[in-house]
Amino acid sequence: MSPAAAPLTLALSKGRIFEETMPLLAEAGIEVPENPESSRKLILPTSDPGLRLIIVRASDVPTYVQYGAADLGIAGKDVLIEHAAQQSGRLYQPIDLNIAKCRLCVAVRQDFDYQAAVHQGARLRVATKYVQSAREHFAAKGVHVDIIKLYGSMELAPLVGLADAIVDLVSTGGTLRANGLAAVEDVMPISSRLIVNQAALKTRGARLQPLIDAFRRASERIA
């Protein structure tokens, strides 16, 4: 099969983004018969023979799209900012799908006076996996910080003295409260966007553009 005739490949991550993408695909008339949560397959067919899904880590979605292993993908704004800080080359982001919404926030122990520390010019240790977003946020506010990169269990860092604060995604705040933390500052609202490989848009645009348009219509109807 020639590359031009091969199915389009959409990169998705498991979990909330996958779940909230399914109604958009359904609105576009595309069904996915297998659920990645129960299937071991990493390449999933769809009801449209011209489209397949690949299941990758959320942080890897932009890389698969940028290097052409996927023609398009869906990734959160948080992931895209971190990817752009580490990789040269820009990804085409035609649509904010307004799915998987949450906030990127600064959070501290409930007994820590964050505002007083900032006002006094204290140098804070901040744990996060969103290094670029955190660095830009604190620089814009003139707050002096040392960034500690972690990959998970962010809430633990202030509890054991590793950090004064964390920057992490927050939906309901339940996990923060359960661990004695509180959000004290919003960094930015987060939602997931459709991203497209720019070379594929040129070479396979006749097939990609209708799918992009279908995503746009579906997101507008569901919003």
UniProtKB/Swiss-Prot annotation:
Belongs to the ATP phosphoribosyltransferase family. Short subfamily. Keywords: Amino-acid biosynthesis, ATP-binding, Cytoplasm, Glycosyltransferase, Histidine biosynthesis, Nucleotide-binding, Transferase. This is ATP phosphoribosyltransferase. One of its GO terms (molecular function) is ATP binding. Heteromultimer composed of HisG and HisZ subunits. Catalyzes the condensation of ATP and 5-phosphoribose 1-diphosphate to form N'-(5'-phosphoribosyl)-ATP (PR-ATP). Has a crucial role in the pathway because the rate of histidine biosynthesis seems to be controlled primarily by regulation of HisG enzymatic activity. It comes from Bordetella parapertussis (strain 12822 / ATCC BAA-587 / NCTC 13253). It is found in: Cytoplasm. It catalyses: 1-(5-phospho-beta-D-ribosyl)-ATP + diphosphate = 5-phospho-alpha-D-ribose 1-diphosphate + ATP. Coiled coil: none annotated. Lacks the C-terminal regulatory region which is replaced by HisZ. Pathway: Amino-acid biosynthesis; L-histidine biosynthesis; L-histidine from 5-phospho-alpha-D-ribose 1-diphosphate: step 1/9. GO terms for biological process: L-histidine biosynthetic process. Pfam families: HisG (PF01634). Its EC number is 2.4.2.17.
